[in-house]
Amino acid sequence: MAIEFTKYHGLGNDFILIDNRSSSLPVLTPEQAIQLCDRHFGIGADGVIFALPGENGTDYTMRIFNSDGSEPEMCGNGIRCLAGFLADLEGQSRNKDSYRIHTLGGVMTPQLLSDGLVKVDMGLPRLLAGEIPTTLAPVEEKVISVPLEVAGKTWEVTCVNMGNPHCITFVEDVAAIELESIGPKFEHHPAFPQRINTEFIQVVRRDYLKMRVWERGAGITLACGTGACASLVAGVLTGKCDRTATVELPGGPLQIEWSEIDQRVYMTGPAERVFTGKL
């Protein structure tokens, strides 16, 4: 049976989207996802996203297989792409501008804006060491500006869970970071039992951050939505930035807000369809 797909990207963080609404289980295996994500012998992508039936009163369920076959809890750029994909699937029958989507990282609510961007209520950041998880602090304590030894250097790190785990460190110049060599050392550090996404952040102004990311299970990517959210939260916690800022990634900018009113994090950015096909 042929499986139709649509390729989307959010600031260059690219995904293969599958209409999986007829089954509560993904129609592809992690091994098949690895093959499809291969940029030389497959379609090429950072991950495969499945649109499944909703759970617990939600509209849909999102599951993701990374390019290495692992399954993350959530993906910020991915959920924006999923919102655009769902709007395409529903077509003329669509009667709403937002969706409640069940993910392994909690319920997320993307909203399709009139200018073509997608705004996502990413929920409350989780800050306790046990919620990351990490052994850098007791389970009921926050991990803010804690020293971490990686590759013979001491890095000051702050940890935030935005549906998936992030370790953020602030640097003078993100362009100078040798991401390909240092990224895996953070990801597989024993302080992070479930591995970790790592963001290197340069504060240009209090409302403008530059970011590079090493994603758990995907490596270097052009953008990471949950990482941008986690980085702004880390910047606020360490007094380095405002609660609303532009986060500039290699693939382009995201607008991030950590609301003082409801303490939830909101992300706004693009989701662009690239092409469709059949497997």
From Swiss-Prot:
Its main location: cytoplasm. The keyword Translocase does not apply. InterPro entries: DAP_epimerase_AS (IPR018510), DAP_epimerase_DapF (IPR001653). The keyword Amino-acid biosynthesis applies. Keywords: Amino-acid biosynthesis, Cytoplasm, Isomerase, Lysine biosynthesis. Its EC number is 5.1.1.7. Signal peptide: none annotated. The record marks 166, 215 as: Could be important to modulate the pK values of the two catalytic cysteine residues. It catalyses: (2S,6S)-2,6-diaminopimelate = meso-2,6-diaminopimelate. Substrate binds at residues 13, 66, 76-77, 164, 197, 215-216, 225-226. The active site is at residues 75, 224. GO terms for molecular function: diaminopimelate epimerase activity. GO terms for biological process: lysine biosynthetic process via diaminopimelate. Pfam families: DAP_epimerase. It is found in: Cytoplasm. GO terms for cellular component: cytosol. Gene3D superfamilies: Diaminopimelate Epimerase, Chain A, domain 1. Pathway: Amino-acid biosynthesis; L-lysine biosynthesis via DAP pathway; DL-2,6-diaminopimelate from LL-2,6-diaminopimelate: step 1/1. Homodimer. Belongs to the diaminopimelate epimerase family. Catalyzes the stereoinversion of LL-2,6-diaminopimelate (L,L-DAP) to meso-diaminopimelate (meso-DAP), a precursor of L-lysine and an essential component of the bacterial peptidoglycan. This is Diaminopimelate epimerase. It comes from Nostoc punctiforme (strain ATCC 29133 / PCC 73102). The gene is dapF.
